[in-house]
């Protein structure tokens, strides 16, 4: 039997952490990094350094390596690939044994995978492109508190996307006027209205006042329309204790859904709130405020598809995903990829959509994809085609900006939505025939006709910053 001996000193990372013959186990957590190495650092050494610094390695040999089974616990860089059209960077694939991570803790996973390694001097830039969570790890996570089907049953809404609106202006309204805006939107045929992500409890509108006026508006709209309605009450707060206090009050007054800013509020807080919602029968809408700080730079940070997976694991029934056609970043292929990761039970590897690994979610429920940001009635055909039924189409300015007011804007969006869904169900190509479909519907809806006239020239035609690397070929 060979005796382990300790040899002090510094050695190349590749000697321990580069293992090209390794075959990943079904239980391994797999990561794909895009690495920009410093000048003079070769690919194998850079990949091995990332594997080491994101698992159990450090800059020098330590004698305590002899007290554990380093060969079992270490991360392994097992494959390197070229980035299409980019000679300065490469993809490194790293496998981590599942026992490196606390069960059900996306916080712990992120602490390793996107921790100190992102400040490592040997790496000029580093981006986490994708992560494969094995089913053995998925089953330790709570996931969405309710999921798509349970929410549809609670709200009694089937066969179409849900329709929402973010109340504007996002800041400055009093609680009473805010409630009035909510009522007008909901009675105009919307399913949901929403707090903006930065509405918490400011001097112009304290949270308790907002909750009370909004719930009064919601119940009044329900009574008048005969439909279930809801408003996403943002319970994001300075402390977890205050967050739960607000959530409890929302439950007491009968609100069906609350909201959380999962990145700004923190993954730990989000997982805790998701558990609370599951135990208390509440729906949880999740906003992605702060995501672009992490994901928009194509060379450094965390890709949004990873943030999508993290949200599904930690818990949320809705997640904002971009629109493709609106004012926010997101190309079509990438967006379709992370929408599937949010909703489907199994998503196969598909490099054309930026998906590097098969992802099996087992029986974990899916979450609604939320399209929000600079959208109006002219976008409806494309939104229905891109997002499908299991989505929330959320028009803020595209509702409240209607010349005849909030209720008319809401009604215009509902007519446009139902016209597009009906046309799709009849087998029509709604993106190609969108103008014809909307024009026909507008003949019976003056609200839609005015909305189409108001926003006919509004487009957001800017180049996408974070493009799929496949598109660089």
Curated annotation (Swiss-Prot):
Chain sites annotated for binding Mg(2+): 194, 196-197
Q: EC? A: 4.1.1.39
Q: Which residues carry this modification: N6-carboxylysine?
A: 194
Give the cofactor binding note: Binds 1 Mg(2+) ion per subunit.
Q: Which cofactor does it need?
A: Mg(2+)
GO MF annotation list: magnesium ion binding; monooxygenase activity; ribulose-bisphosphate carboxylase activity
Which residues does the Swiss-Prot or TrEMBL record annotate as the active site?
Answer: 168 (proton acceptor), 287 (proton acceptor)
Pfam families this protein is in? RuBisCO_large, RuBisCO_large_N
Q: Which UniProt keywords apply?
A: Calvin cycle, Carbon dioxide fixation, Lyase, Magnesium, Metal-binding, Monooxygenase, Oxidoreductase
Question: NCBIfam families annotated for this entry?
Answer: PRK04208.1
Functional description taken from the UniProt entry: RuBisCO catalyzes two reactions: the carboxylation of D-ribulose 1,5-bisphosphate, the primary event in carbon dioxide fixation, as well as the oxidative fragmentation of the pentose substrate. Both reactions occur simultaneously and in competition at the same active site.
This protein's assembly is summarised as: Heterohexadecamer of 8 large chains and 8 small chains.
The miscellaneous remark of the record is: The basic functional RuBisCO is composed of a large chain homodimer in a 'head-to-tail' conformation. In form I RuBisCO this homodimer is arranged in a barrel-like tetramer with the small subunits forming a tetrameric 'cap' on each end of the 'barrel'.
Family under the similarity heading: Belongs to the RuBisCO large chain family. Type I subfamily.
Query: Which PANTHER family does this one have?
Result: RIBULOSE BISPHOSPHATE CARBOXYLASE, RIBULOSE BISPHOSPHATE CARBOXYLASE LARGE CHAIN
Annotated protein name in UniProt: Ribulose bisphosphate carboxylase large chain
């Amino acid at each position: 039997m060979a005796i382990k001996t300790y040899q002090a000193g510094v050695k190349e990372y590749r000697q321990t952490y580069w293992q090209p013959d390794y075959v990943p186990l079904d239980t391994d957590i797999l990561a794909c990094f895009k690495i920009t190495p410093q000048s003079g650092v070769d690919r194998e050494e850079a990949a091995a350094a990332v594997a080491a610094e994101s698992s159990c390695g450090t800059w020098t040999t330590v004698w305590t390596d002899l007290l554990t089974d380093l060969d079992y616990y270490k991360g392994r860089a097992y494959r390197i690939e070229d980035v299409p059209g980019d000679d300065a960077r490469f993809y490194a694939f790293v496998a981590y044994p599942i026992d490196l991570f606390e069960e059900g803790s996306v916080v712990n996973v992120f602490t390793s995978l996107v921790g100190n390694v992102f400040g490592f001097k040997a790496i000029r830039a580093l981006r986490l492109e994708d992560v494969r969570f094995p089913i053995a790890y998925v089953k330790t996570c709570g996931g969405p508190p309710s999921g798509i089907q349970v929410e549809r049953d609670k709200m009694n809404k089937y066969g179409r996307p849900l329709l929402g609106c973010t109340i504007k202006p996002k800041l400055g309204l009093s609680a009473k006027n805010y409630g009035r805006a909510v009522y007008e939107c909901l009675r105009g045929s919307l399913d949901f209205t929403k707090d903006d992500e930065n509405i918490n409890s400011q001097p112009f509108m304290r949270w308790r006042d907002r909750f009370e006026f909004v719930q009064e508006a919601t119940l009044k709209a329900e009574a008048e329309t005969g439909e279930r309605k809801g408003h996403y009450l943002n319970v994001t707060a300075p402390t977890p204790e205050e967050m739960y206090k607000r959530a409890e009050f929302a439950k007491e007054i009968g609100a069906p859904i609350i909201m959380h800013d999962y990145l700004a509020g923190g993954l730990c807080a989000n997982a805790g709130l998701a558990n609370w919602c599951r135990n208390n029968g509440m729906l949880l809408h999740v906003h992605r405020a702060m995501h672009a700080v992490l994901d928009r730079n194509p060379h450094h940070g965390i890709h949004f598809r990873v943030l999508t997976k993290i949200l599904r694991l930690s818990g949320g029934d809705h997640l904002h995903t971009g629109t493709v056609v609106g004012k926010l970043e997101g190309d079509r292929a990438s967006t379709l990829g992370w929408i599937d990761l949010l909703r489907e039970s199994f998503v196969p590897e598909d490099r054309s959509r930026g998906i590097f690994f098969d992802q099996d979610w087992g029986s974990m429920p899916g979450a609604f994809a939320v399209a929000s940001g600079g959208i109006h009635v002219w976008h409806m055909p494309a939104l229905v085609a891109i997002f499908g039924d299991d989505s929330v189409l959320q028009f803020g300015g595209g509702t409240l900006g209607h010349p005849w007011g909030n209720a008319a804007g809401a009604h215009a969006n509902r007519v446009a939505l139902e016209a597009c869904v009906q046309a799709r169900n009849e087998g029509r190509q709604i993106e190609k025939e969108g103008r014809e479909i909307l024009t026909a519907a507008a003949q019976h809806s003056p609200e839609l006709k005015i909305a189409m006239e108001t926003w006919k020239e509004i487009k957001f035609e800017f180049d996408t910053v974070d493009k799929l690397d496949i598109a660089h070929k």
